[in-house]
Curated annotation (Swiss-Prot):
Localization terms from the record: Nucleus
Domain of life of the organism encoding this protein: Eukaryota
Organism whose genome encodes this protein: Sclerotinia sclerotiorum (strain ATCC 18683 / 1980 / Ss-1)
Keywords of this entry: Chaperone, Nucleus
Principal location: nucleus
Biased composition annotated in UniProt, kind: Polar residues: 1-11
Subunit structure: Forms a heterotrimer with H2A.Z-H2B, stabilizing the association of the histone dimer. Also, with a lower affinity, forms a heterotrimer with H2A-H2B.
Gene name per UniProt: chz1
Bias type Acidic residues, positions: 98-121
Protein name as it appears in the record: Histone H2A.Z-specific chaperone chz1
Length: 121
């Protein structure tokens, strides 16, 4: 019987059920010295000072960005949009210089040429 009791305890720990939380000591102020409280206060002050600095710095940065938003009108290029326009690509192709395709074809080998060289027949 004792062997069965030990195995049931082990199988109970392996289930999917909720586990029972271990009790924690929640006493406040007993046995603590004042130096740890001072450390907590100083950390809180440091954190507050850091947050204040970051908030101030970010606010100044946003104000600078707001003043940079003005657009210089001389940088705007007019007449280059093609939305809604009909483009005659045939006429545009006539205006372009003829391309020299001979240079691209010099290194091209067709599949038939490779077969003749490899076969040796």
């Amino acid at each position: 019987m004792s062997a069965q009791t030990g195995s049931t305890n082990v199988s109970a720990d392996k289930g999917k059920g909720k586990s029972v939380a271990e009790p924690q000591d929640v006493t406040m102020g007993e046995g603590e010295d004042s130096s740890s409280e001072d450390d907590v206060r100083s950390q809180g002050l440091k954190t507050a000072a850091r947050e204040h600095y970051l908030t101030t710095y970010i606010a100044e940065e946003v104000e600078e960005e707001a003043s940079d938003n003005e657009i210089d009108k001389s940088n705007i290029i007019q007449g280059r949009r093609t939305r809604g326009k009909k483009i005659d690509f045939a006429a545009a192709a006539k205006d372009l210089p003829a391309e020299d395709d001979e240079d691209e074809d010099d290194d091209f080998q067709s599949e038939g040429e490779d077969d003749d060289e490899m076969g040796g027949n």
